[in-house]
């Protein structure tokens, strides 16, 4: 039997073969096909600026098949949620692949652990929002409703690395027909190491018998396969997060070359909300938020949208030359 | 220098010594002292049934000091959040030690990832809740406001195992003055293994150099120290979660004896919302929820409140005999 060309062969293929199959796979595939069909061909001169797949939040690595313990990656989903809002504002349709429970577009302002603190009951038991929060809550409800009602936002949740990579593969191959109109904005914090499903403990690991030793395998580098096979014409933006600033830009440039990204956005854990560096084959651009009240994502998305439209134009020029 | 008697010496002491100190320690200590003082002496014949410390959600084990990756324990916080509601209803004051981002009392009904789906804007831009949800949202706001306004709910958040155990120690020693009026209801999913802070990687672990090997140490068993030193007269309820039903009750009984708990609540991952078994020195009691619309916690808390009031009475009888 020939290797499935969408899985990239080798390590990636065996990763997908061993992964527990995605629940709701058929429903997700249907929703995806509808969403892409509805928005394909409307880019370029059309109303829509493009279709972007935003990934957001951290993936987990289960340590047990009936999972009690897992390794997680730090990520609130703030970056992906904020970016989704700015992509929608810029006229994109967004496929939002997000970690269950992570930050959601238009909900970022909410108090983390008690949404009830936002509300009070009026004298006639009507639900009221204190004046101080009313404007921001109303704007959030309005923008969210608009995105949903106009069919511009498709939300696909994941928890594990297995779910995430299967979703990315499905979205990647579904968006291939969009060619250069498609963009990937890969802000999720993806596990580098995992325990292969078949070698995983079936039950909760016993704690009575001394220290725990674990060996984890490397997750196959799917960026490469996304770029080469799933959606080769798309505009690809990936992220590189490090805690050590001395190696950050160097690693971002290595990723740019190794995976053929259009942009690698480099950020440090200590100040990722304040500043990012866009690394491209033309050099580096530092993006800083003007103040603590602003989002660094606003300017970042502006710049990326511009670069993406150049990426689309390039094709149009190429086509023009041929005719 | 003599060993600090509140830390339990040995392993526990070295765990606390090496742990990064709790942020806001002074503020938390102040809030705790106020809360306990306000509610002490009001139990027994008084208005208040008692003071309970409910722990909820999973603890994380950081794998790096500037933490990007961590091991997490599966727990939505559903059990602790629901139980807190029923304890408040039964007339308890509740200290709710919860994992940041986990389920909160009176918010359990919310759609997990999009609270905005609950709301819409009316014609005059007023915030409306669709009729279908209005009753439940209003009840939630009313009950939550009542608990907060009457000072019956103190919420203390944690993320890591280091924060959790430091909070438990602070609450344990602060509640000691309540004697038998105090209850611990330890529903949090606490890590069994951890990486000692001083042996932890400082920066994000590199992924380029092949598989990852990790060795994790056992977390000292703090239940024992809670029972023996921090709050020896309190009524103590702990939980035992397993995925393998064959070893569950046996492990629950071992925990009952080993840590001197009053009750160990045994539950299986597969059906923890449907059924639990209360294990005590007098035997086992199975608690099942009557239907999917009910909470198993309702009956569980009823039974525990009854047992706790017997535990309090016992002291009163002992005192009576002496006079």
Swiss-Prot record, chains A, B:
One Pfam short name: DFP
| Keyword terms, alphabetized | Coenzyme A biosynthesis, Ligase
Tell me, which GO biological process terms does this entry list?
A: coenzyme A biosynthetic process
Q: What is its EC number?
A: 6.3.2.5
Listed under catalytic activity are: (R)-4'-phosphopantothenate + L-cysteine + CTP = N-[(R)-4-phosphopantothenoyl]-L-cysteine + CMP + diphosphate + H(+)
Q: Which GO terms describe its molecular function?
A: phosphopantothenate--cysteine ligase activity
Kindly give the InterPro entries that the UniProt entry links to this protein.
CoaB-like_sf (IPR035929), DNA/pantothenate-metab_flavo_C (IPR007085)
* Metabolic or biological pathway, per its Swiss-Prot or TrEMBL entry: Cofactor biosynthesis; coenzyme A biosynthesis; CoA from (R)-pantothenate: step 2/5
Q: What class of enzyme is it?
A: ligase
Q: Which family does it belong to?
A: Belongs to the PPC synthetase family.
Report the protein's function.
Catalyzes the first step in the biosynthesis of coenzyme A from vitamin B5, where cysteine is conjugated to 4'-phosphopantothenate to form 4-phosphopantothenoylcysteine.
Assembly and oligomerization: Homodimer.
Name of the featured protein = Phosphopantothenate--cysteine ligase 2
């Amino acid at each position: 039997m020939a290797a499935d060309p969408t899985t990239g062969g080798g390590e990636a293929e065996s990763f997908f073969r061993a992964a527990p199959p995605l629940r709701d796979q058929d429903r997700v595939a249907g929703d995806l096909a509808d969403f892409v069909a509805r928005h394909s061909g409307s880019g370029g001169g059309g109303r829509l600026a493009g279709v972007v797949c935003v990934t957001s939040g951290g993936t987990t690595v289960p340590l047990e098949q009936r999972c009690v313990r897992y390794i997680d990656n730090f990520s609130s989903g703030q970056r992906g949620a904020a970016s989704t809002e700015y992509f929608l504002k810029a006229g994109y349709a967004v496929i939002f692949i997000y970690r269950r429970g992570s930050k959601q577009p238009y909900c970022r302002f909410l108090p983390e652990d008690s949404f009830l603190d936002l509300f009070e009951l009026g004298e006639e038991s009507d639900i009221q929002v204190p004046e101080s929060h009313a404007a921001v809550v109303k704007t959030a409800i309005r923008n969210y409703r608009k995105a949903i009602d106009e069919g511009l936002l498709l939300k696909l949740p994941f928890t594990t690395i297995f779910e995430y990579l299967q979703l990315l593969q499905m979205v990647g191959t579904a968006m291939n027909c969009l060619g250069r109109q498609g963009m990937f904005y890969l802000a999720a914090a993806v596990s580098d190491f995992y325990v292969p499903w078949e070698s995983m403990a079936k039950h909760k690991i016993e704690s009575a018998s001394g220290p725990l030793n674990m060996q984890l395998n490397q997750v196959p580098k799917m960026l490469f396969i996304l770029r080469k096979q799933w959606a080769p014409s798309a505009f690809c933006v990936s992220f590189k997060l490090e805690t050590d600033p001395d190696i950050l830009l160097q690693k971002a440039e290595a990723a740019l070359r190794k995976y053929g990204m259009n942009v690698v956005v480099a950020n440090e854990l200590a100040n990722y909300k304040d500043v990012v560096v866009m690394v491209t084959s033309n050099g580096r651009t530092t993006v800083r938020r003007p103040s603590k009240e602003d989002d660094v994502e606003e300017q970042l998305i502006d710049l990326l949208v511009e670069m993406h439209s150049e990426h689309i134009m390039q094709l149009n020029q190429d086509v023009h030359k041929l005719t």
